[in-house]
A protein has these predicted regions:
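Phosphate-binding P-loop
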Residues: 21-29, 101-102
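Conserved lysine of the Walker
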Residues: 42
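Hydrophobic positions on the alpha1 helix immediately C-terminal to the Walker A/P-loop
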Residues: 45
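Active-site signature of alpha/beta-hydrolase-fold catalytic machinery across serine-
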Residues: 48
Length: 122
């Protein structure tokens, strides 16, 4: 499902504002890359990281899915298949967050299945 650049920018800025709420950049940022199949323990590792360092931003693609400008209509039309229609938007959001937050020197947790190495390596 298509979205305009303006819609993307609006959604991106809202997400960015929300995740930066209580975080500060650091001189030497750390990126934690957690990958594995569902049930592998990624969420538990994330909790351990947060206990040790509260100044970390977790990048979680599923948390941004509802920010798609057509999320509700996609849900209504496609139901359980809706994630494949919102995935291009999510990919763009995640890639931009990783790039921008890395440039701004924030600590990050990047979680996913790591089906490909493209996003983490970039």
């Amino acid at each position: 499902m298509n979205y305009t650049n303006a819609e993307f920018e609006l959604a991106y800025e809202e997400i960015l504002k929300r995740i930066l709420f209580d975080k500060i950049p650091v001189q030497n940022p750390i990126a934690y890359i957690l990958g594995g199949q569902p049930g592998a323990g990624k969420t538990q590792l994330q909790k351990i990281i947060f206990r040790k360092n509260k100044n970390v931003i977790a990048i979680n693609a599923d948390a941004y899915r509802q920010s798609h400008p057509r999320f509700e209509s996609i849900q209504d039309e496609f139901g359980d298949d809706s994630p494949k229609y919102t995935q291009p938007f999510i990919n763009e959001i995640v890639e931009r967050l990783i790039s921008d937050l890395s440039d701004m020197k924030y600590n990050l947790i990047i979680e996913g299945t790591l089906r490909t190495a493209d996003v983490p390596l970039n």
